[in-house]
Amino acid sequence: MTTSQSLFEKAQRVIPGGVNSPVRAFKGVGGTPVFIDSAKGAYITDSEGKRYIDYVGSWGPMVLGHNHPAIIDAVLKAVPNGLSFGAPTAIEIELAELVCKLVPSIEMVRMVSSGTEATMSAIRLARGYTKRDKIIKFEGCYHGHSDSLLVKAGSGALTLGQPSSPGVPEDFAKHTLTCEYNNLASVKQAFEQYPNDIACLIIEPVAGNMNCIPPKEGFLQGLRELCTQYGAVFIIDEVMTGFRVALGGAQSYYGVTPDLTTLGKIIGGGMPVGAFGGKKEIMEFIAPTGPVYQAGTLSGNPIAMSAGLACLTELSKAGNEQLLAEKTKTLAEGFKALADKHGIPMTVQYVGGMFGLFFTEQTKIESYQDVMKCDVKAFNTFFHKMLEKGVYLAPSAFEAGFMSLAHSDEDIAYTLEMADLALAEMK
């Protein structure tokens, strides 16, 4: 029995499923999850001392690489001053100012402790601001585990939402409309059906929770126009894409301006931080300046703010945005070339510092329906072969991969060398 197997058995006795977030259990790919002891740069080291080149990056935050000196130094300097005050600090102003500078659509920002809190709060704010109840989300997009958003499409092309998890009341889920990602007509139909009832529309600008699906040309702009036309708040969920697709987020990359933006992952530099922000007129509707209530004991935690400020300061240095994109392109196109070499059907999609591998004959993946046609078993086989060879990919066919600035040319070359061997073994 390996150390990870032993730890997993022990964990399952006191933690549901042995993990504190479901995807970590490896249920999507099978086998025992790898328990990690430490990480540095592009590498993670498991409980038995084996090192892996890491393309999960703590599910996105580690854009600079693990254990980055600038972030560690900032945290070590902040810790002696106290871990939490429950009071305003100067450091939270600095981080807020930098966020507003990097993301021009954000005129004011409120810090929270997770991406789920950010999306949940943004939706509550939109409902309070518009005095409407219904929201639009997209099939296959994930915005955290709040009740409004754990909703899937019903049986029709456009139906009232059905809960996708026990514990979410149908009466609550009925306020959530689920449309098809990259299908503007389905969104237009929703607005036409409920012209005065929709408070907001929320979307992942690049769908990273059904692997990596960029928006069709004009799709985000079309959503912006519909929200403006019907008086709905347009929310872009940049928890995953923020500062990774581009410094200004996917919204700057694709040239679209939301009313509200949600952030997470990178904004904390590895610490638990989320944020939501946008137009001053809307943001001032939140307490204490407005009637919509939102609060958090650890919101603006000084240690987390210090880590986030250090991360964004380092990331925003000249050349880093382009370098991250170039590294991702090299890896992604390398995967595709190797799959073609071995005659294994694969489509690879990437944008900025994120990428997705789809085992499929389809040449373009644009929707949840397309993703469902992909060969999950082939991905699972590839995942385990790469894991054996020291490369750690996301343990799910439906999750994006993440590049970091710490991945060297040699790391990427080794990854592709191992992929060459893995794909050869799959023929």
Curated annotation (Swiss-Prot):
MF annotations from Gene Ontology: glutamate-1-semialdehyde 2,1-aminomutase activity; pyridoxal phosphate binding; transaminase activity
PROSITE patterns: AA_TRANSFER_CLASS_3
Catalysed transformations (reactions): (S)-4-amino-5-oxopentanoate = 5-aminolevulinate
Keyword presence, Glycoprotein: no
Stored CDD domains: OAT_like (cd00610)
Residue numbers carrying N6-(pyridoxal phosphate)lysine: K265
InterPro entries assigned to the protein according to its UniProt record, in alphabetical order: 4pyrrol_synth_GluAld_NH2Trfase (IPR004639), Aminotrans_3 (IPR005814), Aminotrans_3_PPA_site (IPR049704), PyrdxlP-dep_Trfase (IPR015424), PyrdxlP-dep_Trfase_major (IPR015421), PyrdxlP-dep_Trfase_small (IPR015422)
GO BP terms, alphabetized: protoporphyrinogen IX biosynthetic process
Enzyme Commission numbers on file: 5.4.3.8
Location relative to the cell: Cytoplasm
Keywords: Cytoplasm, Isomerase, Porphyrin biosynthesis, Pyridoxal phosphate
SUPFAM superfamilies in UniProt: PLP-dependent transferases (SSF53383)
Pathway as given in its UniProt record: Porphyrin-containing compound metabolism; protoporphyrin-IX biosynthesis; 5-aminolevulinate from L-glutamyl-tRNA(Glu): step 2/2
Residues annotated as signal peptide: none
Enzyme class of the recorded protein, top EC level: isomerase
Cofactor(s) listed: pyridoxal 5'-phosphate
Gene3D superfamilies: Aspartate Aminotransferase, domain 1, Type I PLP-dependent aspartate aminotransferase-like (Major domain)
Recorded GO CC terms: cytoplasm
Protein family per UniProt: Belongs to the class-III pyridoxal-phosphate-dependent aminotransferase family. HemL subfamily.
Annotated NCBIfam families: hemL (TIGR00713), PRK00062.1 (NF000818)
Subunit relationships: Homodimer.
Protein name (Swiss-Prot/TrEMBL): Glutamate-1-semialdehyde 2,1-aminomutase
Organism: Glaesserella parasuis serovar 5 (strain SH0165)
